[in-house]
């Protein structure tokens, strides 16, 4: 009996050693409590690419929203096209949505404070009305929403509207000009425009030189035609100067515009080129003294002068006179000479010192000075 008992114990012991001595197969490990039981997979997954529509909508800038409507008869409305052709005499009414609307329209209407034009602001829209229209009213009409903070307003570029209106009038192919002869200055550093604008959208317009008589081609390189502006000289130079005119043809009719004198500008744009000169730098008591400030510049650029002089604090009476004229410097080059002269009579001790002249134009200002001594 003991033998069988011992034999049974030996068999149980060997069985336990077999169980505890087993090794886990490769790539296997016991799972930890709470571990994810989902088996890993080697399946490739393509990254999700957003649709083109989604990406474009995220990256694109906000589109400009047209806020302009044209009022038709019987209370009908329509969005105006980029260009409109209307008969002269018709009434035009434009409305733009917004509680604060800014307007732009042909300068002709603003220059003469024309009573035919009415601009009103209603609670929800701005309103522009033009009655008894003429061919001279041809041009761009535009509006925009104003974003205001107190008294400071700026244009909302995303909410605008515009239309260019041709007012066709019998016998008028060109937008009328206030004169029979005009001057166009050719600056080497900016475009020049011969303002031959027509009143008929379909009109064919050509540019001509008076002498020698020939057509000047608008080749798209040196000269282009813009129906809203006229003939544009992209890079003016001295060979372009001379007398030119435009010819328009439409509906079997033809018409010639006013003439334009093209003058080349010798002085480039920039702050005034200024010099100062005194009639004498040493003055005796009782004598008169004049100080001259001179600017050479572009023919169509105005210059403003200001003076600082020794007797200014004592309210010393002086005479200041400003003048300008055009001078021709050969080969058709034209320059504007602007001058300001300050004159002091009966020179006294308080008049001695620095005479300072400041000349200013749209590009900047220049200050020059000279000394006048008492002798």
UniProtKB/Swiss-Prot annotation:
Entry keyword set: Disease variant, Disulfide bond, Glycoprotein, Immunoglobulin domain, Repeat, Secreted, Signal
Keyword presence, Cytoplasm: no
S-S bridge residues: 96-143, 293-357
The keyword Disulfide bond is annotated on this UniProt entry: yes
Top-level taxon in the UniProt lineage: Eukaryota
Location of region: Disordered: 22-64
GO molecular function: platelet activating factor receptor activity; platelet-derived growth factor beta-receptor activity
Tissues/organs with expression: Expressed in colon, lung and liver.
Entry coiled-coil feature ranges: none
Sites carrying sugar chains: 132, 219
Biased composition (Basic residues): 40-50
Pfam families: Ig_3, VEGFR-1-like_Ig-like
Chain ranges of the Ig-like C2-type domain: 62-159, 272-375
GO CC annotation terms, alphabetical: extracellular region
Primary location: secreted
Cellular localization per UniProt: Secreted
Signal peptide: 1-21
Disease linkage: Colorectal cancer: A complex disease characterized by malignant lesions arising from the inner wall of the large intestine (the colon) and the rectum. Genetic alterations are often associated with progression from premalignant lesion (adenoma) to invasive adenocarcinoma. Risk factors for cancer of the colon and rectum include colon polyps, long-standing ulcerative colitis, and genetic family history.
Subunit text: Forms a complex composed of PDGFRL, TNK2 and GRB2.
Protein name per its UniProtKB record: Platelet-derived growth factor receptor-like protein
Organism: Homo sapiens (Human)
């Amino acid at each position: 009996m003991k033998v069988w008992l011992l034999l049974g114990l030996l068999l149980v012991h060997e069985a336990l050693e077999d169980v505890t001595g087993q090794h886990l197969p490769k790539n296997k490990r016991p799972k930890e409590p709470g571990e994810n039981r989902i088996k890993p997979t080697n399946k490739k997954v393509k990254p999700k690419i957003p649709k083109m529509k989604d990406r474009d909508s995220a990256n694109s800038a906000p589109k400009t929203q047209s806020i302009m409507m044209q009022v038709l008869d019987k209370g009908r409305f329509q969005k105006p096209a980029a260009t409109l052709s209307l008969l002269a005499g018709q009434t035009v009414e434009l409305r733009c949505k917004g509680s604060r609307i800014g307007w732009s329209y042909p300068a002709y209407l603003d220059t003469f404070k024309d009573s035919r034009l009415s601009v009103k602001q209603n609670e929800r829209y701005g309103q522009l009305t033009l009655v008894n229209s003429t061919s001279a009213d041809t041009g761009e009409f535009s509006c925009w929403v104003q974003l205001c903070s107190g008294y400071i307003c700026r244009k909302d570029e995303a909410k605008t509207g515009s239309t260019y209106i041709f007012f066709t009038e019998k016998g008028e192919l060109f937008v009328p000009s206030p004169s029979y002869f005009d001057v166009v200055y050719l600056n080497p550093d900016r475009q020049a425009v011969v303002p031959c604008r027509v009143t008929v959208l379909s009109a064919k317009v050509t540019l001509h030189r008076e002498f020698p008589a020939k057509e000047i081609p608008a080749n798209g390189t040196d000269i282009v035609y813009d129906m809203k502006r006229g003939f544009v000289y992209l890079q003016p130079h001295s060979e372009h100067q001379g007398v030119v005119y435009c010819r328009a043809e439409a509906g079997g009719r033809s018409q010639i515009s006013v003439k334009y004198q093209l003058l080349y500008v010798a002085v480039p744009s920039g702050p005034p080129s200024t010099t100062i000169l005194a009639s004498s730098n040493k003055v005796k008591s009782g004598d008169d003294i004049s100080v001259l400030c001179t600017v050479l510049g572009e023919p169509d650029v105005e210059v403003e002068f200001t003076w600082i002089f020794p007797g200014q604090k004592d309210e010393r009476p002086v005479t200041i006179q400003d003048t300008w004229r055009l001078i021709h410097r050969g080969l058709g080059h034209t320059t504007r000479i602007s001058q300001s002269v300050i004159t002091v009579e009966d020179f006294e001790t308080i008049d001695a010192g620095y005479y300072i002249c400041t000349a200013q134009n749209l590009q900047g200002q220049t200050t020059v000075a000279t000394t006048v001594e008492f002798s």
